[in-house]
Each structure stands twice: as C-alpha cells, then as structure tokens.
A protein has these predicted regions:
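Acidic/charged, solvent-exposed loop-and-adjacent secondary-structure segments enriched in E/D, K/R, S/T
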Residues: 95-122
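Short, conserved active-site entrance elements at the starts or edges of catalytic domains
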Residues: 113-149
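A short, amphipathic edge element
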Residues: 23, 52, 123-135, 182-187
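Short, structured patches in soluble enzyme cores that scaffold and shape functional sites
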Residues: 72-74, 95, 138, 148-150, ...
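Gly/Pro-enriched, hydrophobic low-complexity segments
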Residues: 100, 104, 124, 141-236
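N-terminal mature ectodomain segment of secretory-pathway/periplasmic proteins
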Residues: 19-96
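Sec-dependent signal peptide recognition
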Residues: 2-10
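Hydrophobic h-region of N-terminal signal peptides that target proteins for export
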Residues: 10-18
Length: 241
C-alpha cells in the first residue's frame, strides 16, 4: 500500500498532461536540431547595465547535432576569432593574435566566450535531454513548464533550469538558469521564429545575465538549411583560414 501511495502521484501527473517531461525534452532537442545542416550570418549585440552596445558579426555553421563552427568577422579586434565544437564535447578556440588553436579544457568550458553572455559550453551544446531529467511543473494556454535537473554524474554549473516549451512547435520560449545556491543567474529567450523549408528555426535569441545586468542578443540573417555542408568546414585547419 505504501508503495502504491508513492507512485500514485506520478501516475496521475502523467495522465494529467498526457506526456512526460522527458518526452517533451526529447521533442525539444529533435526540433532544435531538425535541419541536416545550416549556415548563417550571426549578429551579436552586447548590452551592458548602462545600455551601452557593442556589435559583433560572425559566420556560423552547424552540421547535425554535434558539429558547429563560429568565425568572427567584425569588429577588427575580434576578426578571425573562431570556435569549433565537435562530437563528445570536444571544443577548440582560435585567437589570431596567438596564431594557435587551443583545445577548450574542461575547467574553463563554463567561462564566458569573447565577452558575450554565452559560455563555451553554451555554444557547443546541442541539446538538453542528454544531460538533464525533466518534470512538468505546470502549464498555461500555450506552454508546458518544465523543471530540468542535471543527471547524476554530469558536470553543470546550474542547480536546475526552468523551461517554457511551446505546445505546438516544441521550441523553448524561455529558459531560466539557476546557480548552485538556487538564485536566478541567466535567462534565455527565443524572440523570433521563421519557417524555413518546413523547419521552425529561431532567428532572434537573447541571453541575459541577471547578476551582471548584461545581455547578448543574437540575430541570424541569410540563413540557409540543408545545403550539404562539407565536413572540411568543421576542422582545426579551417579555423585558421
């Protein structure tokens, strides 16, 4: 009887929503990584607490769910800076001033990249379901509300995430990141979505560090999908070009 009482709330929750939190999270990953590949011009606007802005542009390439290259074009002091993410959480960064490619060590992957509010891990992350367990903690007319907790053995700087998922598209509308003490740290919002070749793809994303009162807005322009990108793009040698 005690065992039945323990599992009854979980059974009722599953019947209430008709889908589990982990199933929703898998759908989120599937939608976010649906195109075979994509290339785009990325505009990054960095805004400090006084409202001052810095604008950076970069070429961005992605193939599948585990290959990504970002190469900065401007401003001049950032031109050529590149970030490469490969399978199995392998990441590299290239700074032209040093003329060398460096592998991103595990102890710095949660540091912010090139003055943005995104960490190396954020840039190299291709999904949530691999590292997080999800439970549905609420819903509204348009969204499921999930609480994501890191799976045992994963190395994450967050105690948990709170995610609002669109019921129709299964795109995350907003994700709140909470630090180890349970305080709100960062908020990611998808602020615009386009349908390209049948894929619902975010074209404007903001990431706000509420502690530093700093925000990064990413806008993706001239996006092309399923173009047959070569694997040669996702190499250390290509970073140096």
């Amino acid at each position: 009887m005690k065992g039945l009482k323990a599992i009854l709330p979980m059974l009722l929750a599953g019947n209430l929503y008709g889908i589990s939190g982990n199933d929703i999270l898998i759908k989120v990953d599937s939608v976010m990584n649906a195109p075979k590949d994509r290339k785009t011009l990325m505009k990054m606007t960095l805004i400090d607490e006084k409202g001052n802005e810095k604008v950076r542009t970069a070429e961005s390439y992605q193939k599948g769910k585990d290959k990504r290259l970002i190469k900065f074009i401007s401003p001049a002091d950032q031109k050529g800076v590149s970030f490469l993410a490969l399978p199995n959480d392998v990441m590299y960064v290239y700074f032209p001033a040093f003329r060398s490619v460096r592998r991103v060590a595990s102890h710095i992957k949660y540091q912010e990249f090139a003055g943005t509010d995104l960490t190396y891990n954020d840039l190299g992350s291709f999904g949530y379901s691999k590292d997080y367990n999800a439970e549905i903690v609420g819903e509204d007319d348009v969204s499921y509300i999930l609480k994501l907790t890191p799976k045992p053995g994963t190395d994450k700087p967050y105690s948990y995430l709170k995610m609002w998922v669109d019921k129709k598209t299964f795109l995350p509308q907003k994700v709140e990141h909470y630090d180890k003490s349970g305080s709100l740290w960062k908020v990611m919002r998808i602020e615009g979505v386009k349908n390209i070749k049948g894929y619902n793809i975010p074209y404007k994303i903001s990431v706000e560090n509420v502690k530093k009162k700093h925000k990064t807005i990413m806008e993706f322009e001239n996006m092309e999908v399923d173009v047959g990108l070569s694997d040669d793009i996702f190499t250390v040698s290509y970073m140096r070009r």
